[in-house]
Design a protein with these regions (language model features):
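Juxtamembrane/start-of-transmembrane alpha-helix segments at the extracytoplasmic/lumenal side
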Residues: 382-396
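Consensus positions within tandem repeat domains that build extended binding/scaffold surfaces
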Residues: 22-25, 45-50, 68-73, 91-96, ...
Length: 506
C-alpha cells in the first residue's frame, strides 16, 4: 500500500458498511496523492494520514464530526481540504506541518479547536474562525509565515499562549463588534481595559512602540520576532513580561525595565542580537528600590551576543539558568568551551559563556546565579557584608595567635637541656637594660691569676725573660688600673685601654 498513488475506499466490504478509518491507517504512505472516503465513514482515527507527503486533496464526509489529533499532520503537499458540514471538533495538530495549505474553510458547526492546529502551515494566508468557537488553543498559528491578517470573532473569549508566534507577515489584527473580551487599537490586540497586551503583529513596520499607561501585562509571545522594532518604551506601571514576549526581536537596541516589573518570563528577551543596553530601574538602590521581588526566568537574555554588561537591582529574588552572559556556539565553532544541556523540548542545547560579559549585582540571587552556572561568568558585587568580613578577620587573627603559641610550646618541649639553658640565659639577658649589659659581662669575667714576679733562677734566656717581665708588668698595670680608675696609666696605655673598653661595650 505504501506505493499506491490513488486509493478509493469501498463503502461496503462483504456486506458491511465501512464506518471507520483506523489510527495511522495510511500513515507514511509517501506515494499517496489522493483518497476517496465513502459517505458511510463517521470516524477517522488519529494520525490516519500522518506523513502522506504526496497527498494533495482530501474531502471528509459530512458524517465525520470529529477530526482527531494529527489526522493530516505533515501532509506537506496538501492544498485542497474540505471538511464535513457537521464537523464540531478538530483535535491537536490536526493540520500541523501542512506546509502547502493556503486556505481552510472551517464549517460553522465547529465549536472546539485543539492546540497547535495550524502549526507551521507556512503557506496559510487566510482562515476564519467559526462564531461558535470560544477558545483558541495554544500555538494555534505558530509558524504560519504567510498569515497576513486575523479577525477575532465576537464570541472568542480566550486566545491561547503563543497563538501567533512566528507569524512575521502578520500586519492586521481586528476584533468583531460585540466581543466583550478583546479590542484592537491601532492593530494591536488588548483586553477591553488595555491592561493586557496580547499581540503586536510582527509584520508591522514601526520602529518604536510605547505601551499605554494602563498596560500591566505583556502576554506570552506578544512581540515575538517583531524584527522592525528598534525601541520599546514601557510604562512605569508594567508588572509582568511573559514567556518569549520579545524573543527574536533582533532590531531592539536598548530597553529599560521598570521598578514595578516582578516577572520576566523564560526567553523573554532571548535572541535579541542587536540589544546592547539593558537598564533595570533602581539597580543602584541598595535598599532594593520601590518594586517587589523580581523573578527572571530561564534563558531570559540568552544569545544576546552584543549585550556585554547588565546591572541587576537588589530586589532580584531569583535568576533562571543561562539567563545572562550565555550564548550558543555557532555551527562552525570548533572550540570545546561549552556545556551540553537538555532544553525544555528535550533537545540537546550547547551553551557557552559570552565573551567579555560582566554581570553586576548584589550578593544573593545574582551572585548565586553566577556561582551555580555551568559556564564561567564574570561578576562584580555591589555590596559586601562587612560584619561577616570583620568576624572572619577576627577569627583569623585568633587562629594565627593560637597556632603560634602552640608551635612555641611544641618547640620548647622538644629542646635539649643545653638549648633550654641557653634560652633562659637569653631571656634573662633580654630583661637587663641595654646600658647595663656590657658591665654585667665585665663583672662576670674571671680575674687574671696574680703573678708574684719571681722567675726561675735556672731560666737564663734574657730575651724571654724580658718578654715575660713586660707581660707581667703590663698585666699588673692593667689589673691595678681597673681598681684605681686608670689614675696612673700612661697616655699610650690610656689609648689602648679605651679601645679595649669600647670593644667590651660593643
Amino acid at each position: 500500500m505504501e506505493s499506491a498513488t490513488h486509493i478509493s475506499i469501498m463503502p461496503k466490504i462483504d456486506g458491511y458498511d465501512i464506518v471507520s478509518i483506523g489510527e495511522e491507517a495510511f500513515a507514511n504512505c509517501t506515494s499517496l496523492q489522493s483518497v476517496t472516503i465513502p459517505a458511510s465513514v463517521t470516524e477517522i482515527g488519529s494520525a490516519a494520514f500522518y506523513g502522506c507527503t504526496a497527498l494533495t486533496k482530501v474531502t471528509v464526509p459530512d458524517a465525520v464530526t470529529k477530526i482527531e489529533q494529527g489526522t493530516f499532520f505533515s501532509c506537506t503537499a496538501l492544498t485542497d481540504l474540505t471538511l464535513g458540514k457537521d464537523t464540531t471538533e478538530i483535535g491537536d495538530m490536526a493540520f500541523g506541518y501542512c506546509t502547502s495549505l493556503e486556505t481552510v474553510t472551517l464549517p460553522d458547526t465547529v465549536e472546539t479547536l485543539g492546540d497547535q492546529l495550524f502549526y507551521y502551515c507556512t503557506a496559510l494566508d487566510e482562515v476564519q474562525i467559526p462564531e461558535k468557537v470560544t477558545e483558541l488553543g495554544g500555538y494555534t498559528f505558530y509558524g504560519c509565515m504567510s498569515l497576513k491578517s486575523f479577525t477575532v470573532p465576537k464570541n472568542l473569549e480566550n486566545i491561547g499562549a503563543m497563538s501567533f508566534v512566528a507569524c512575521p507577515s502578520l500586519e492586521t489584527i481586528a476584533v468583531e463588534d460585540g466581543n466583550t473580551k478583546y479590542q484592537a487599537v491601532d492593530n494591536v490586540l488588548y483586553d477591553t481595559e488595555e491592561s493586557i497586551l496580547y499581540l503586536y503583529p510582527a509584520g508591522r513596520t514601526d520602529t518604536s512602540f510605547t505601551l499605554p499607561e494602563s498596560t500591566l501585562v505583556v502576554y506570552a509571545g506578544a512581540f515575538f520576532a517583531a524584527g522592525n522594532l528598534q525601541q520599546i518604551n514601557f510604562d512605569e506601571k508594567l508588572q509582568y513580561i511573559g514567556e518569549m514576549a520579545f524573543d527574536f526581536c533582533s532590531g531592539l537596541t536598548s530597553l529599560t525595565i521598570p521598578k514595578a516589573v516582578t516577572t520576566i518570563g523564560t526567553t523573554a528577551f532571548a535572541d535579541c542580537t542587536g540589544l546592547t543596553s539593558v537598564t533595570f530601574s533602581g539597580a543602584s538602590d541598595e535598599d532594593g528600590g520601590e518594586g517587589g521581588d523580581l523573578e527572571i526566568g530561564d534563558y531570559a537574555f540568552f544569545c544576546d551576543d552584543n549585550l556585554k554588561e547588565v546591572q541587576l537591582p537588589k530586589r532580584v529574588s531569583s535568576v533562571g539558568k543561562y539567563a545572562f552572559g550565555c550564548t550558543s556556539p555557532a555551527d562552525d565553532d570548533d572550540s570545546e568551551d561549552y556545556v551540553t544541556v537538555s532544553s525544555d523540548s528535550g533537545d540537546n542545547l550547547k551553551v557557552k559563556a559570552l565573551d567579555g560579559f560582566l554581570l553586576i549585582g548584589y550578593t544573593g540571587a545574582a551572585s548565586d546565579y553566577v556561582k551555580d552556572c555551568d559556564v564561567k561568568i564574570s561578576f562584580k558585587a555591589m555590596n559586601v557584608n562587612w560584619k561577616a568580613v570583620m568576624l572572619w578577620g577576627i577569627l583569623a587573627v585568633v587562629l594565627v595567635a593560637v597556632l603560634l603559641i602552640a608551635i612555641r610550646l611544641i618547640r620548647r618541649n622538644m629542646m635539649t637541656a643545653e638549648e633550654k639553658k641557653a634560652l633562659q640565659e637569653a631571656e634573662a639577658e633580654h630583661k637587663i637594660p641595654l646600658s647595663q649589659r656590657g658591665k654585667q659581662d665585665e663583672a662576670a669575667e674571671e680575674k687574671p691569676e696574680y703573678d708574684d714576679g719571681y722567675r726561675s733562677i735556672l731560666d737564663d734566656d734574657d730575651e724571654d725573660e724580658a718578654e715575660e717581665v713586660a707581660d707581667y708588668e703590663q698585666t699588673i698595670s692593667h689589673s691595678q688600673l681597673h681598681h684605681i680608675g686608670h689614675a696612673d696609666m700612661p697616655a699610650a696605655e690610656d689609648e689602648k685601654k679605651d679601645k679595649e673598653d669600647e670593644k667590651d661595650e660593643k
